[in-house]
């Protein structure tokens, strides 16, 4: 049996949740990656998050991650799609995705249930938009209504970069996202659009934080 430590009634963004947090997790094997020409490996940085979803989930991620993907793009236009398919043999995903964007990059990340069993997703997405880069990221949560979904998103924007996020959050019993952008380059722009659909006892929460450290920068948030 897989040993677990149980955290009962701890709070994330003032949402009270009860989770069985696994100490060891088998590799998540049901992943589809469609990639034009980007360099993809698993050498993520593992740097501490500025905000994230709290110490418990962050430590769980760094200690037990069962999927790590680092994407490094060229100066050309590139399209990448990553789909995580939850099934009866892949119920828990503790993942990190790191995107280092240099050109014009589109990334679609999808979490989808192919089972009625309860699934757990605890993810970190970290994006670095280098000078003059354009990065579009779309995140789609299609987990079943028994599942828990937690995503921590952190971005760094360099000079003249533009980062656009679209978050489509439909699935999960509890779904929590923390979004943070560190805008350090002049003329950098960040745009965030989110779509949330919840029924019955579904709980949705997203927290947005942006730090604009130089002049001529902008962030637009549309929820």
Regions found by a protein language model. Give the residues of each.
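Long, low-complexity, mixed-charge
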Residues: 1-68
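Conserved beta-strand/loop scaffold segments within soluble protein domains that form the structured core
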Residues: 51-223
């Amino acid at each position: 049996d897989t040993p677990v430590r149980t955290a009962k009634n701890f709070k994330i963004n003032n949402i009270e949740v009860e989770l069985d947090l696994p100490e060891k997790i088998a590799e998540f094997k049901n992943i589809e990656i469609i990639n034009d020409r980007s360099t993809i490996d698993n050498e993520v940085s593992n740097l501490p998050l500025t905000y994230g979803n709290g110490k418990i989930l962050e430590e769980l991620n760094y200690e037990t991650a069962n999927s790590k993907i680092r994407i490094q793009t060229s100066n050309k236009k590139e399209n990448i799609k990553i789909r995580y398919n939850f099934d009866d043999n892949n119920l828990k995903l503790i993942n990190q995705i790191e995107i280092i964007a240099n050109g014009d990059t589109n990334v679609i990340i999808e979490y989808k249930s192919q089972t009625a069993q309860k699934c757990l997703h605890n993810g970190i997405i970290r994006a670095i938009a280098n000078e003059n880069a354009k990065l579009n990221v779309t995140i789609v949560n299609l987990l079943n209504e028994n599942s828990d979904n937690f995503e921590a998103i952190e971005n760094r924007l360099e000079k003249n970069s533009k980062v656009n996020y679209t978050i489509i959050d439909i699935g999960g019993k509890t779904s929590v996202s923390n979004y943070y952008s560190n805008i350090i380059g002049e003329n950098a722009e960040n745009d965030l659009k989110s779509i949330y659909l919840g029924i019955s006892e579904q709980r949705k929460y997203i927290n947005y934080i942006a730090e604009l450290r130089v002049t001529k920068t902008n962030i637009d948030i549309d929820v």
